[in-house]
Amino acid sequence: MPVVKVRENEPFDVALRRFKRSCEKAGILSEVRRREHYEKPTTVRKRAKAAAQKRHAKKLSRENARRVRLY
């Protein structure tokens, strides 16, 4: 859990902004959205596999684009 200590003479909105930023860096909101509803293990594996395939395709396309460029 991110903790933000409010400094002396610091406006509330600045402290709130720092807290939101630390929550975003910690990934709390995305974790809450992910856990909002139960997801079957097969669905989790299927989604992870699809993400891995997408990353691999993106990597290959970047490598091919690098080879094609002939300056």
Swiss-Prot record:
One annotated Gene Ontology cellular component of this protein: ribonucleoprotein complex
Region of interest (Disordered), residue spans: 38-71
GO molecular function: structural constituent of ribosome
PROSITE patterns: RIBOSOMAL_S21 (PS01181)
UniProt entry keywords in alphabetical sequence: Ribonucleoprotein, Ribosomal protein
Ranges of biased composition (kind: Basic residues): 43-59
InterPro entries: Ribosomal_bS21 (IPR001911), Ribosomal_bS21_CS (IPR018278), Ribosomal_bS21_sf (IPR038380)
Biased composition (Basic and acidic residues): 60-71
One Pfam family it belongs to: Ribosomal_S21
GO terms for biological process, alphabetical: translation
Domain of life from the UniProt record: Bacteria
Keyword Ribonucleoprotein set for record: yes
Family per similarity comment: Belongs to the bacterial ribosomal protein bS21 family.
HAMAP family: Ribosomal_bS21
Official protein name in the record: Small ribosomal subunit protein bS21
Native source organism of the sequence: Aliivibrio fischeri (strain ATCC 700601 / ES114)
Lineage: Bacteria, Pseudomonadati, Pseudomonadota, Gammaproteobacteria, Vibrionales
Gene name per UniProt: rpsU
